[in-house]
């Protein structure tokens, strides 16, 4: 695993939750002795949905809802087996989606 990079992508609706999770991951990786790059904040995806308040008519009366998806990117350079084991045992809060990919340098 010496010439590989582990890329971790975090997604969540709450930015406080995602920042705390990224901090946990970075702290765990640094304890195992691997080099870490990040967290890099990626653009926030904002989805807006407009619905009518009334059932039949009154098209002028509308309501808008939005859902923001925050993303963070963490790269672990040359992860060791100890790093992979520590990350697999790490407990993350509900509401944080984690995607882990390994790639060659």
UniProtKB/Swiss-Prot annotation:
GO MF annotations in UniProt:
structural constituent of ribosome; tRNA binding
The family note in this entry says: Belongs to the universal ribosomal protein uS10 family.
Free-text function comment from the UniProt entry: Involved in the binding of tRNA to the ribosomes.
Q: Which domain of life is it from?
A: Bacteria
The cross-references to InterPro entries, in alphabetical order and at most eight, read: Ribosomal_uS10, Ribosomal_uS10_CS, Ribosomal_uS10_dom, Ribosomal_uS10_dom_sf
Quaternary structure, from the entry: Part of the 30S ribosomal subunit.
Gene Ontology cellular component list: ribonucleoprotein complex; ribosome
Name the keywords, alphabetized: Ribonucleoprotein, Ribosomal protein
Q: Does the keyword Cytoplasm apply?
A: no
Q: Name one GO biological process term.
A: translation
Gene3D superfamilies, from UniProt?
Answer: Ribosomal protein S10 domain
What is the protein name for this chain? Small ribosomal subunit protein uS10
């Amino acid at each position: 695993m010496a010439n590989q990079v582990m890329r971790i992508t975090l997604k969540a609706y709450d930015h406080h939750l995602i920042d705390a999770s990224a901090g946990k991951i970075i702290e765990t990786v640094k304890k195992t002795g691997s080099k870490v790059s990040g967290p890099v904040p990626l653009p926030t995806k904002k989805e807006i949905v407009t619905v009518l308040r009334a059932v039949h008519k009154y098209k002028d009366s509308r309501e808008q809802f939005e859902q923001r998806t925050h993303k963070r990117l963490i790269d672990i350079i040359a992860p060791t087996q100890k790093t992979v084991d520590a990350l697999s045992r790490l407990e993350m809060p509900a509401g944080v989606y984690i995607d882990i990919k390994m790639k060659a340098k």
